[in-house]
Structures are given as C-alpha cells and as structure tokens.
Design a protein with these regions (language model features):
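Bacterial N-terminal signal peptides
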Residues: 5-16
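Extracytoplasmic small-molecule ligand-binding "clamshell" domains
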Residues: 21-89, 98, 159-160, 234
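Short, well-ordered beta-strand segments
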Residues: 26-30, 132-135, 179, 210
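Periplasmic-binding protein-like
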Residues: 31, 108-117, 184-227, 244-245
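Alpha-to-beta junction loops
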Residues: 62-63, 79-88, 130-132, 163, ...
C-alpha cells in the first residue's frame, strides 16, 4: 500500500511539473505600435518586442503567445489574469508601478512632434497657436501633454486616438495639425509617409515589461532573459531589423 501511495505522489508531482512546463504565457500587445509591436498584413504579431520576447522565452524555457489588447484596457486585462505580461513598448511610470511590477528598463525613447512634410510650423508655434494635436489615448506621453498643457496654458487642443498611426492618417487627411508620439512610431511613419519629425517634447521614457506584482519569479526570468539577449549578437540584429538605429 505504501508503494502505491508513493507512486501516486510521484505521479502527481510529475503531472504538476509537466503542467507548469506546458503553460503558455500570454503577452498583451498594442496591435498598432510599429516597430515595437503590431499585427502584420498576414495577421501575425510582429515587431521588436515580439521577436525579443520570443527569443527570451526559448532561452529561458517557457512558451509565449502574443495577443492584441486595447491599450486603454491592457493593465486591467493583466490584473484580471486575461494576459500574463505586457511586452509592448510600455513606459515605466510611477502611476503604473503602483499597479504592476516592471522589469528593468530595456529601451529608452524620446517624444516628438510630427507634421506634414511641407508644413511650415515650428515647435514654438505648436505651443502658442490654437491647433489640434493628435495623440494615442492611454499613453504616458498623452498624460504628460495634458498635464503640462493645463499648467502652461498652451492653446492647442488634444485629440485622442486608438493608435499613433491613426493620428498620422488624420494628420495627412488634414483633420489635425500635428501628431505627437514616441520617436520609434514617428520614425516609422517618416520613412513610409509624407511626414517629418519636427522636434521633441516631454521627457525621455524607459520601456519595461509589466507583470502582476505577485509574479516575481517570472519577472526574474524576464530580467535574466533581457540580460542574456543584450549580450547576444541577436540584440543588434533586432535593432537593425526593427529600429534602424
């Protein structure tokens, strides 16, 4: 009887270990934030963060899949356990850090204004004139802009969009005067559309991977994974492929 009991215990533990190994971590991504995260023309999640996390998952021995999530609701989805992490160009902010745990920063970005290629506007005029500035809703740069606008008394109006590329389209269609966003999607637009980066605003931002606060062991894997990735030649390949820097 004792042998049977021990056999069942071993079987149970083995099953638990197999279940843990089979777990697929769900990464919530912004479906329209090139070049860090987006869904390509074939419907496949792509981008710098997607490729980086795929490499880390393989190296650290876990499985991952990438699922587009509305950016405004991405942290609530993480807390509700509908996704397991956010590796999608998320800026580390004190407000977000109250709700989630962040990895060590893996990238820095600045914020920029984008205008039509033939626009005569200057940065000074953006702050001084009653223009319309398009920004992605739920982003740290949009919050910074709204807060500073109230403090400084800037005359422009902020119009919010579901994504930065949507703001670019309205810029080209003449519905807004300026788009404001992180540098990477602005540079992506500048390469593909008749627009130009006009100048910078706000503060330099740091990107990190967000997980639930109780998932510290998983967070350690992410941090170790990025440490290994940055020491591997593949890191420079990713930068060359996606960021062109």
């Amino acid at each position: 009887m004792q042998r049977i009991v021990w056999f069942l215990v071993v079987l149970f533990l083995a099953a638990g270990a197999a279940h843990a190994a089979d777990k697929v971590y769900v990464n919530g991504i912004d479906a329209n934030y090139p070049p860090f995260a987006y869904v390509d023309k074939t419907g496949k999640p792509s981008g710098f963060d997607v490729d980086a996390l795929d490499w880390i998952a393989k190296k650290m021995g876990f499985q991952v899949k990438h699922v587009p999530v509305d950016w405004d609701g991405i942290i609530p989805n993480l807390l509700a356990k509908k996704i397991d992490l956010i590796c999608s160009g998320m800026t580390i902010t004190p407000e977000r850090a109250e709700k989630v745990a962040f990895s060590k920063p893996y990238w820095e970005v600045k914020n920029v204004f984008v205008v039509k290629k033939d626009s005569p506007l200057t940065v000074e005029e953006i702050y001084a004139k009653p223009l319309t500035v398009g920004m992605q809703a739920g982003t740290s740069e949009a919050k910074w802009m709204a807060d500073e606008k109230a403090k400084q008394g800037w005359k422009f109006t902020i119009k919010l969009y579901d994504s930065s590329p949507m703001a670019i389209e309205d810029l080209l269609n003449g519905r807004i005067d300026v788009a404001a966003m992180n540098y990477p999607p602005a540079r992506d637009a500048e390469r593909k559309k008749p627009v130009k980066i006009l100048g910078t605003f706000g503060e330099v931002e740091e990107f990190g991977v967000a997980v639930r606060k109780e998932d510290q062991e998983f967070l350690e894997k992410i941090n170790k994974g990025f440490e290994l990735l940055k020491a591997d030649p593949y890191w420079e390949e990713l930068i060359s492929k996606h960021l062109n820097q």
